């Protein structure tokens, strides 16, 4: 993705002389572009700020918004550049992060929530009463206490590692049934 210039896809190699050219690239989504993840079937996942996740058809460029909705009992907070990971054990599976881990077994058509809030949910960092949860900075666009990285295991299908922007490192060995916070337990890191 490119700041203020959308999400683009392009080849890693070409057959014509001169290497990869500007015309080899194609814009697939607008906004502040982030991840573009291929599905393998002529579609990609593309996202812009605030976790606005889309599934895009590369032939028609038609896009479908697939961001998980908030369950009745919880407000979701998405990072400016939300966590996105393809399931290495299921080609249709997709993990997505807010302050919770979400999983779709069918390319974003439906979602299940695999975790509680895995962040500190620190009111001082959230400042809900004064800012609605936005961290006041020059952009006025940053949510805090959000998941930044999701790493599903390639060899243990039920294992997940999750990192948050407020210092948590969460691990689940049972696909989100239980979570252990490893923050402060890694040698050489705060």
Predicted features along the sequence, with ranges:
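Beta-propeller blade termini and top-face loops
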Residues: 1-190
């Amino acid at each position: 993705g490119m700041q203020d210039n959308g999400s683009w896809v392009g080849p890693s190699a070409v057959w014509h002389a001169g290497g990869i050219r500007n015309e080899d690239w194609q814009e697939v989504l607008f906004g502040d572009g982030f991840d573009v993840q291929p599905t393998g079937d002529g579609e990609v996942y593309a996202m812009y700020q605030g976790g606005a996740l889309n599934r895009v058809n590369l032939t028609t460029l038609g896009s479908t918004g697939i961001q998980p909705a908030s369950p009745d009992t919880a407000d979701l907070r998405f990072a400016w550049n939300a966590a996105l990971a393809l399931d290495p054990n299921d080609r249709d599976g997709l993990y997505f992060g807010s302050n919770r881990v979400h999983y779709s077994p069918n390319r974003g058509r439906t979602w299940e929530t695999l975790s509680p809030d895995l962040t500190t949910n620190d009111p001082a960092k959230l400042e809900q009463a004064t800012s609605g949860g936005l961290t006041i900075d020059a952009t006025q666009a940053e949510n805090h206490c959000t998941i930044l990285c999701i790493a599903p295991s390639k060899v243990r299908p039920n294992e997940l590692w999750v990192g948050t922007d407020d210092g948590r490192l969460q691990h689940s060995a049972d696909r989100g049934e239980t979570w252990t916070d490893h923050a402060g337990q890694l040698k050489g890191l705060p």
